[in-house]
Every structure is written in C-alpha cells, then in structure tokens.
Amino acid sequence: MKIRHIACGLAFQALCLGAHAETRHGAVEFPVARQLNCYQANDFNWPADGSGIKNPACRAAYQEVYKKHDNNQGQATLQFNQWNEYAKNIADYNDFEAVKKAIPDHQLCSAGNSVPGNDKSGMDVPSPDWHASTVAKDQNQAMRLKFKATMPHDPSFWVIYLSKPSYDPAKASLTWNDLEEVGRFDNVKLVGGYYEMDVDLKDKLGKRVLYTRWQRNDPAGEGFYNCSDINIVASAAKK
C-alpha cells in the first residue's frame, strides 16, 4: 500500500509538471523568492516525507502540504517545482478590493493557491528560518530587484510592497495590512531574460518581507505574487 501511494504521488507530480510546462512565467531571483530558494536547494524529492530538506522553513512548507493531502508527495513538491507559477487570475485587477478577495490575508505568499492540484500554502507557514537575502541600499537608498522571466508578458505593471516593522514572519502569515507600498512601475523592459527595477527603500532597515506583484494587462487578469525575505543594510554587503 505504501509503495502504491508513493507511485501515485509521483504520477501526480509528473502530470502536474507536464500540464504546466508551457504556462510558467517567472519569479523574483533577487532578493530570492521563498519558493525559488526552496527549489534551488534541490533536496526535496526524497525521502517522500520531506525529512531530507535542509532548510527548516522549506521543510515545514513541504510537510504542511504533504500532510494536508494525506502524505501525497506530488502535492507537496508542486509548490517548489512550480516556482515560476505563483499566479492568480483576477479579471477586475485594477480594483484592489478584488485583489484582496482573490488573495486573502494569510495566503499572500502562496498567491491564494491552496486547493488540491495547486496547493502552494506551504509558503505561508510562519518560520524564523526563511532564507533572508541581504539587501544593500545604494547611494540613492534604493535596491535593484531582479525578476527572472521564463515567459515575458507585456503590457504589464508592477507593485512592490514591504512589510512594516511590526510584522514578524516567524509568528504569523502575511496579511495586506502588514504591507506598505514602496514602488510602482509600468511596462518594464525585458533585458536578457530579466525584468529589473530600482526600488526606493528610503530609511527602511532590518528584516522585512518584500512582496512583489507583477500584473498583466489582459482580459484574464493574470498576476504573479512573490514573497522575498530580506535584511536591509545601509551599505554594500555580501548576501
């Protein structure tokens, strides 16, 4: 029975990967998004229960989804393998209330995806161990955000948020009220497979969560949402 269950999980994973191979779109490479960091570690395929995952936050994310779906490996690995498809279709995407309804509080880092077959809710699990990229502000108090695009979309716009000092990702999942907008960009040019933006961080310092929204201007209203854990410092430092 155990062998059959694992086989079913792997079959589900293969089915999901095949179904989504042509529709993946990208993720924040710097500061690295949670799901991309977990994916790049490449330590989640075995053992099936995720016990071999080294980063405690990535391991907790995996096991959250694994246990929710009756120890299904395919469900759990999907949130890592689909690192570039943290998306939600919102037809009325210019209405912020519609965005908040589609991506409710405590589901921001999963882009509101928490259903069987597309459950990325492990990214919403509170943990003190999410990898935090060191972000050194330049002389203009800005940081360079790099978004790796596996499929470019234009026209589009970007909204960048930063968590408030009161928010602690170790204790609670992210909510909209935890965020403040720090940047907005229209039709950023794709260069060498990346969208890059200089985000003004002003006087912000310390550990925060950077929340990136990339919104397509199309009838379906497809948008992409990423959480990046960061530590903002005043001068250049090694990440």
Regions found by a protein language model. Name each.
Residues 163, 204-219:
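Internal, hydrophobic beta-strand segments that form the core of beta-sheet-rich folds
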Residues 161-195:
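Exoplasmic/lumenal beta-rich domain surfaces
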Residues 22-153, 157-158, 165-168:
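N-terminal "mature-chain" segments and other terminal, solvent-exposed stretches
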Residues 16-18:
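N-terminal signal peptide c-region/cleavage motif recognized by signal peptidases
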Residues 222-238:
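Short beta-strand elements
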Residues 154-156, 206-208, 224:
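Short loop/turn segments at connectors of secondary-structure elements within structured domains
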Residues 196-203:
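Short, hydrophobic beta-strand segments
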Residues 1-7:
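Bacterial N-terminal signal peptides that target proteins for export
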